[in-house]
């Protein structure tokens, strides 16, 4: 089950979205299994998303490419921030972090393949930072019964003080433009003078023109050949 960091979970609970709905309503048997302590998997950390030479997402303690812990790392600023478990590594869409100041970041989440949602769907969050990744806030960007596959239809991009969330719809895309100012909570009314917008990509076809992550990476990647060496007995201890 997706684990959302406590600081982000508190924000989502305030707006009336329980942490359980971020992943799925599961059977009692599976809920019992997920309530057990997470084993320590004998695997090396992987960089699954790199912004530049000192900023990246580290994937750790994973059983496979869809179930692990993610951390945002900035070696220059000495930042290591928990991004949760079974979340960002499952996002299948396009991601561009291109704020030249380095202050504003976004990392969308999804759920592992074949996640069973409740009859009201899965509410799926993104997390964003306005302080260079020291802290993150959360908001829901998608409600769906198939978060893993549906995330393929999304493009997320940060450019300076703007966050773009674009959902592909047939031959076009619907784009919501969010303002990113220091400490903003995008789940609440914006401060005076701060505005966002929405539009179709066909109306503003150049809105992402020239935007790129400094490393050039636009998707999460994971080496599926790396698997735990622990045997079942070791994992159960």
Predicted feature residues:
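Bacterial N-terminal signal peptides that target proteins for export
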Residues: 2-12
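Bacterial signal peptide processing site
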Residues: 26-29
């Amino acid at each position: 089950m997706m684990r959302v960091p406590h600081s982000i979970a508190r924000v989502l609970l305030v707006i009336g979205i329980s942490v359980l709905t971020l992943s799925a309503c599961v059977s009692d048997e599976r809920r019992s299994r997920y309530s057990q302590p997470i084993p320590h998997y004998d695997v090396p950390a992987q960089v699954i998303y790199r912004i530049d030479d000192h900023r990246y997402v580290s994937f750790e303690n994973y059983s496979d490419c869809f179930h692990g812990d993610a951390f945002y790392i900035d070696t220059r600023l000495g930042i290591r921030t928990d991004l949760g478990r079974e979340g960002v590594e499952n996002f299948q869409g396009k991601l561009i972090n291109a704020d030249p100041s380095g202050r504003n970041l976004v990392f969308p989440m999804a759920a592992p393949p074949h996640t069973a949602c409740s009859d009201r769907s899965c509410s799926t969050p993104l997390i964003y930072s306005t302080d260079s990744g020291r802290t993150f806030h959360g908001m829901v960007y998608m409600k769906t019964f198939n978060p893993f596959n549906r995330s393929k239809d999304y493009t997320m991009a940060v450019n300076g003080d703007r966050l773009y969330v674009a959902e592909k719809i047939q031959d076009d895309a619907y784009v919501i433009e969010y303002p990113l100012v220091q400490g903003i909570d995008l789940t609440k009314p914006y401060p005076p003078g701060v505005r966002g917008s929405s539009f179709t990509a066909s109306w503003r076809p150049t809105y992402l023109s020239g935007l790129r992550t400094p490393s050039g990476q636009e998707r999460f990647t994971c080496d599926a050949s790396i698997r735990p060496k622990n045997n079942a007995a070791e994992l159960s201890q």
